[in-house]
Amino acid sequence: GSTWSLSGDDVDTPHLAQILEFVSAHWRVDPNRRLLTGMSDGGTFSYVSGLEPASPFTHLAPSCAAFHPMLAQMADAERLRGLPIHITHGALDWMFPVEMARAARDALSAGGAKVSYRELDDLSHVYPAELNGAILDWMALADRSGRR
């Protein structure tokens, strides 16, 4: 079926909101600890969806994602201010060069986001599963209390 694209309608964000609503209705979910992450195009989607003003996600963790500074420029200033974002990218990434991650770090930091940046010298365009624990630790410590 259809899915999101930078140039098309975002059909996935409403579905994610429905899933989160369902999960929250059936299990205990900390409203101050809702992580949106993804790798490659999924990481790019975490920027696109997670920077929306009404996004229910409190923390973003894109990995090996494409980024255009326009995303930060178009982001709602209040949403961006203080938003914890953990960027992970491989220095050897052949699909989305590491300069994209550096640009994301710089643009999002300039917009007021609380950016944590991790560049891995020996990583190409691969998800660094060994960092899952570190990302969860970061989320536990990166405060976003009381803000959506």
For the regions a language model picked out, list residue spans one by one:
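Short glycine-enriched nucleophile-adjacent loop
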Residues: 43-54
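C-terminal catalytic histidine-bearing segment of alpha/beta-hydrolase fold enzymes
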Residues: 86-88, 94-148
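Residue-level signal for short, function-critical loop segments
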Residues: 40, 66, 91
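Alpha-helical scaffolding within the catalytic cores
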Residues: 66-78, 99, 103
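Short beta-strand immediately N-terminal to the catalytic nucleophile in serine-hydrolase-like folds
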Residues: 36-38, 63, 88
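A conserved short beta-strand
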Residues: 55-67
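Extracellular/periplasmic catalytic domains that process cell-envelope and extracellular macromolecules
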Residues: 28-29, 52, 78-81
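Gly/Ser-rich "nucleophile elbow"/oxyanion-hole loop immediately N-terminal to the catalytic nucleophile
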Residues: 4-41, 56
